[in-house]
C-alpha cells in the first residue's frame, strides 16, 4: 500500500527545514563550536536523502566532514568525506557533485596534513585540483599544495603554490575564509624561510580578518601561528598569545588547535613557570590522545609515533 502523497505545503515545509538545518550547520562550522554543527547536518543529510535531493546530501556531508575534522574526529571525517570523491570523478558528473568532490579531496588532504602525512595530503590535493572547475575549489587545493610543501620542507614549491592560490582570490574581499587561510600559509612559508617578522605580519592579518568575520576557530588558529612566529622572533608577547590561542581553542573543543598551542606554551614556560608548563603539557597530551581515539589503528600508531607528538610523552 502506497503512502499518502506529500502536499505542496508539506513539501515547502520540508524544504524550509532543510535550508534551516544547512544554514545552522554552516554557521556553527565557520562561526561557532564545530561540534554544534554535527546534529543539524546529520538531520539535514537524512531529510535530503528521504527527498532524493542528492546535491543537498552532498553539501551537508561535506560540511559534516569539515565539522568533524575541526574537532579532531579525523576518523569520522574521513568516513564521511571519502564517499564524496568517486561520484564527482565520473565523466558525466553533475557540476555540484564535481565541486564537492574537489572540496572533499582538499578536506581529506587537510586531515592527513594535520596528522603529519604531507605526502598523502599532496596526493589528495592534486586529485582535488584535477576536479576543480571553480576558483573556490581550485583555491582550496592550491593552498593545500602550498601547505603540503611547507610540511615537506620545500620552500620554493610552497611559495609558488601559495602565489597561485593568491591569484585566485585577488579582488575578492568577501572571501574572508580563503583570505584568512591564505595568511596562515603566508605565515607558515615565512617561518619556513626564517622570516619571523613576515610571519608575524601575516598571522596578525589573519587574526584581524577572522575577528572581523566573527570566526573564533579561525581566530584561534591565527593566534597559534602568531604565537609560534613570536617565539621565533624572541618576542615576549608569545606567551600571552599562545595562552589566548589555547584558551579559545579549548572553549571551542578544537583538539587540533589545542594540542600544538598547549605543547608550545608548555615548552616555553618550562623554566619560568614549571607548574603552568606541566599543566599545559598535560592538556596537550590529553588532546593528542583524544585525536588518537578516533583514528584507525595503523594511522593511530603513526600519529603517536610522530616525533613532535611522541616527544610530549617522553618529557
For each feature predicted by the language model, list its residue ranges.
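Alpha-solenoid helical repeat architecture
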Residues: 10-19, 51-63, 92-107, 133-144, ...
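Amphipathic alpha-helical segments of tetratricopeptide repeats
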Residues: 42-49, 78, 82-93, 122, ...
